[in-house]
Amino acid sequence: MKKVFIQVPATSANCGPGFDTLGLACNLYNEVSYEITDRKGFQLEVEGEGADYLKPFGRNLAFASFLRVWNSVTCGQRIGLKVKMLNRIPMSRGLGSSSSAIVAGLFAANALCDDYYTKDELLGIATEIEGHPDNVAPALYGGFTISYMEQEKAHSLRLLPAKPLKFIAVVPDSKLLTSLSRQAIPKTVPHKDAVYNTSRASLLVGALLSGNYEYLGMALEDKLHQPYRAHLIPGLPDVFAAAKEAGAYNAIISGAGSTVMAYASPEADCERIAKAMVDVFAANNEHACYHILDLDTEGVKKI
């Protein structure tokens, strides 16, 4: 029998102005084991997020992505497969739960196939499954990633900030489906808004690489997606304001939401920032919890 243990990080896409382009990995992890067994069929054990409804069939990304690599390398060799998941990444909250499942499955199958594919090749497969690379890239590589498509092929550049940052992820109880969140975004935007975001995304990368974090307050601003999604997250403008008033550089919608993520200095009072944001959600009849996180710099790995 063959078995592999995988750790895969949560991710936060967009990072404010970098819609469908920028992403980061943080130190909140799902742990998954994949075991090839003599017993036919698929078995699944889940602890934590999704334990009450994840099944080993249908659209289960952890199985489907595993089989995508396994079948391509082994020419469809039939196997029994047992998967055990310890899920800490909240589902449908904008922290990359689907990307973590995709990347875990691809990486596990690849490990059991003697690393047949490179990570860059896995990025291409993951993007085909997910539809865009901004979450799967940081899950694979760790750090901050800048992703782009060229001739229908995904590419990503990993970078590490010059100085540490803290990320305060405030997670409302209410889920927000990516499909619904995407429907809120118009198909066209004013040219001036596109220019606005280009300048902010460029400033964000420059601030991270140079360590000039005083620019993050402005660099994390956005006009391409967050204004159109704001009505889907109760009290969002006030949550942003509370984060900044409590000492964060700024706050953004993490991925498609509903999580709101504040960026802060390690010297900031992150508990104060988190509680200020939680209090605003509570004032809008929305319970929320929070995680104070660091950047993950490794991405998916065997443990």
Language-model features, listed with the residues they occupy:
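ATP-binding N-lobe of GHMP and related small-molecule kinases
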Residues: 1-93, 111, 115-117, 295-298, ...
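FAD-binding core of FAD-dependent oxidoreductases
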Residues: 12-14, 18-25, 92-102, 130-145
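Solvent-exposed alpha-helices and their adjacent loops that cap or buttress functional pockets
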Residues: 14, 23-26, 75-76, 129-130, ...
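DPxDG-like acidic metal-binding loop motif
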Residues: 28, 95-119, 140-142, 150
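Short beta-strand-to-turn element immediately C-terminal to the catalytic PLP-Schiff-base lysine
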Residues: 35, 139-141, 145-150, 261-265, ...
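Alpha/beta catalytic cores of group-transfer enzymes, especially the acyltransferase/condensing modules
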Residues: 117-164, 251, 257
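Acyltransferase
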Residues: 164-241, 245
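Glycine-rich, charge-dense phosphate/pyrophosphate-binding loop(s)
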Residues: 208-303
